[in-house]
Every structure is written in C-alpha cells, then in structure tokens.
Amino acid sequence: MTQTRQQLGKARRWIIKIGSALLTNEGRGLDHEALAGWAEQIARLRASGREVVLVSSGAVAEGMSRLGWTTRPHALHELQAAAAVGQMGLVQAYESIFQRHGLRAAQVLLTHDDLSNRRRYLNARSTLRTLLALGVIPVVNENDTVATDEIRFGDNDTLAALVGNLTEAQVLVILTDQKGLFDRDPRAHADAQLVSEGLAMDPELLKLAAPTFGQLGRGGMATKLHAAARAARSGAYTLIASGREPRVLERIAEGEQIGTLLCPDKEPLAARKQWIAGQLIAKGELILDTGATKVLREAGRSLLPVGVTHVKGEFSRGDVVTCVDPDGRPVARGLVNYSADEARRIMKHRADEIEGILGYVDEPELIHRDNLVLL
C-alpha cells in the first residue's frame, strides 16, 4: 500500500460517479440488485464517517426501457423525454434503497447554466454543503430535461468533477466497466499494463486514452482524464476503477491498490478561480502574441491589450473568454474587463492609450490576474 493510497483512504468527502453500464440491465432499465449493492457500500462509507455525493447515470437508460426503446436516440427532444421518464424510476429506486440503511437521499439536478452564473453557483454550493452537513446523500444528475446543446455538461464525468470543485471534495471516484487506464488498448493488446498512478494534468496520459462511446453512456476514458484534471484544480485525487470489482468502494477506502489513481500536482486554486476554470463554455477567444503568451505562462501576470493580436466571438464585460497562443493552443481562461467590440479597438495598444481610443478607462488590463486561470 502506497502512502498516497493511505491518504486517499483517509479522505472525508467523496464524490462517487457510477456509469450507466453499472446501473442497468444491459440497457433494459435499472438493475435494482446492482443499485442495492452500491447503496450498501455507500452506507458503509457513511458509517465510517465519510460524506458522499453520488453522481448517477441511468435516467436515460431507464427511460428508454420504460418507453420500449432499444437504441439510444440522437435527437435532443427524445433524449430529454427519456430522461424525464427515467428520472422518476431512478429517484424512486435510490430513495427506497437508501431508506433500508436509514439514510436519506436528495435529488439535485444541474445544468451548466447553473454553474456558469456566479450567484447560482454559490447557491448550489450552499445547498450541497447543507445536505452533507445534515447527513443526506445528494444524488446528482444533469438536468437533461431542460439542458440544450449549448449548456450541456456533455457527460457525468465532467459533472462529477465540477461537483467536486463545488463541494471541495478530497476524492473523486469514477466507476466504470474498465479496470482503469492502460498503457495500450487492452482490447487489441493482451500485454497492456494498467497505469497504477499518475499526475492528473499529465498531457502524456491523454495520448493513452482513445475516445470510446457506448450505446448508453456518453463518455470514454479521455473524458475521465479531463474530469480528473478538473478535479485536481481543487486539490482532489481521482480514482478510476472497475465497478465490477467486489467491494470496490470499501477496498479503495482501505487503501488497496486498485484502478488508476490520478494525483493533483499543484496547489488548489482559490474558490473563485475554481469557478472560472470550471466554465465549459467561453464566450470568446483572445489570440495572444508570443510575448504575452510567455508572460502568462511563466509569470501569471495580468493580460494587457498590447499582447492581443486578434479577438474572436462576441462577449460582454465580465464574460469568460479563452486566451490562446499564436498556434491556437489554450493558455488561460479569465473574466474579461471589456466587451468584444472594445477589445478589438484597444488590442495591440498600450494601457496608457486606452482612454484616447475609447474615451474612458475601466481597467488597464484586459484580464486581471486575479480573474485569470492558466490551463
């Protein structure tokens, strides 16, 4: 047992994400026996003093079963209908199963809109923290019924990581039908080796994760690695493991070397910067010259208009924008001090020239370093 695994086992607040394949009867609705098994393991974690937030897939699969559909639909309105029907069964199942262990569950449905708005983000954080303080197990899912393509998280791995940021959890456990991350595709290479530990933000790991998509789920190993990187921003460890392993949650809590453990390698971001980093949808893009790129990456300074060569998109003051280098690679994300039109007028100019161009000066920086997060 490594020291890191021991620390993992001592973590108090856990986010547990369980994929569709582990909750359904091969697409034929919910597997109530499987749900009962997960509830029993979670109840034991709670009895040991740990707090648990459950991010559960399965609503669409259950809805498909109730509606008699055998193939996952592609049309958004059909997915939303299936989610609405299936959510009823999912909530009823969790409420009943957790009651057997003397536990209360709460349904929490979120969209990216809820987390991109600062006030709603803080409200969601307060609600989740209150539920945990009351000993309740929040069961979180994306609000598929109202989410549009523009405001979707895209997968529950991403949602789980953002909920981890929201609640300042120490551990994110992503349970899947795979044993973890391998150095080669195990389906094609019999000698593929499991990656036991790594750094959550190591770009080399992404090269090992070819995107995969099943009929019921939306994400593959690549989405799980991106989720781990997001979770690391608040200092959380991510453990990707097979939900087919017996007593998997208890064994993780005991510090057993199971699955792939991805560790944070930087200090946690401040709460406000976690919120900025968690924005999945940027309103615009600022293309930087090589000098500005270097200053941001190496010194983490504020972004001045003189270092911007192009402005893409339409945005307002206070919106989230992405900063990219001359080759289009993301450098940072931040809250911009000027609208897109204003930014186009002052780009390539020094800060002391802003008033002469616009007739006023809101801020000398396009993005202040306190509102800037390096990617």
Swiss-Prot record:
Any one Gene Ontology molecular-function term assigned to this protein's record: glutamate 5-kinase activity
Where it sits in the cell: the answer is: Cytoplasm
Annotated PUA domain ranges read: 283-361
PROSITE patterns for this protein: GLUTAMATE_5_KINASE (PS00902), PUA (PS50890)
Under which pathway is this protein filed?
Answer: Amino-acid biosynthesis; L-proline biosynthesis; L-glutamate 5-semialdehyde from L-glutamate: step 1/2
Q: Which reaction does it catalyse?
A: L-glutamate + ATP = L-glutamyl 5-phosphate + ADP
User: Which residues does UniProt assign to the signal peptide?
Assistant: none
Identify the enzyme class. transferase
Q: Which InterPro entries does the entry link to?
A: AceGlu_kinase-like_sf (IPR036393), Asp/Glu/Uridylate_kinase (IPR001048), G5K_ProB (IPR041739), Glu/AcGlu_kinase (IPR001057), Glu_5kinase (IPR011529), Glu_5kinase/COase_Synthase (IPR005715), Glutamate_5-kinase_CS (IPR019797), PUA (IPR002478)
Binding, ATP: K17, T176, D177
Q: Which NCBIfam families match?
A: proB (TIGR01027)
How is this protein named in the record? Glutamate 5-kinase
**Organism lineage:** Bacteria, Pseudomonadati, Pseudomonadota, Gammaproteobacteria, Chromatiales
